[in-house]
Amino acid sequence: GSGLVGSEMCIRDSVTGMVDKDTPAVFITGVDITSMAVTDILIYRQEAGLVNVALDKNSGVSAAVYPYRQLSPQDIDGDGIIELPCPEADSAAEQTDGFVAWMSWKSDGRFEQSAKTYHCLSAGWYFTIPLSWWNWDVDALVTAISNENQMTLRINGDSVLSIYTITGENRDSRSRMGHRLVLRRQTTTVYAGEVFEIAPYYGMDEDLLRRSFNLILGTWNNS
């Protein structure tokens, strides 16, 4: 076991929500000195009172331990159940952008992956990775020019789609260049997307690109 003691843990947030469709829970996340997020999932059982369903019976601490990248447990896929973020571990702790697996825990302590996203906290958006891509070699290439960031998702080295974060005076005209389509407009930023020629082969089109793109809301609200 990791022998964590309370004093080494900095409690980041607590979130209330459902762990199964009929079981409310409190998700309390602490971050340890190695930048791992440790989440206790507390439910109330008539016979036992408060129970931590994420508890590892052997180590006596939570088994819900994932790299911390400033993301909170949340219902990422809209199914009414809270998922825990599990960012890809190979990025540095300061790096807030990257792929995230979202794990849903059951009240009996079982868990499974229920979503995958590319989260771009630096620009305030995320993209839901289609289920059919989960077993493929998907990577992200990020490039930046003046007033424009581009994130390209590639499968087996093929560029499938790009998402652009565009600022500056001529952002509207740049959001419509070539085959780009406008995804969202904010006060000073336009988010645009583009699907490339190979996209249909991987089941991606402009409609799915639109539906898979979301702005991150209330990220900074540490409730």
Q: Residue locations for each model-derived region?
A:
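Acidic/hydrophobic-patterned starts of short beta strands in beta-sheet-rich repeat architectures
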Residues: D20-G30, L42, I76-E88
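Secretory pathway targeting signatures of secreted, lumenal, and periplasmic proteins
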Residues: P130-L183
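Surface-exposed amphipathic alpha-helical segments
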Residues: W133, G193-S223
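Beta-propeller fold detector
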Residues: S7-E8, N52-S59, Q113-Y118
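Conserved blade-ending motifs and adjacent loop-strand segments that build the rim/top face
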Residues: V53-Q74
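Structural motif
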Residues: S2, T34-A48, S91-S107
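Beta-propeller blade termini
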Residues: R12-D20, Y68-G78
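Single conserved hydrophobic/aromatic residue that forms the stacking wall/gate
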Residues: G1-G6, C10-D13
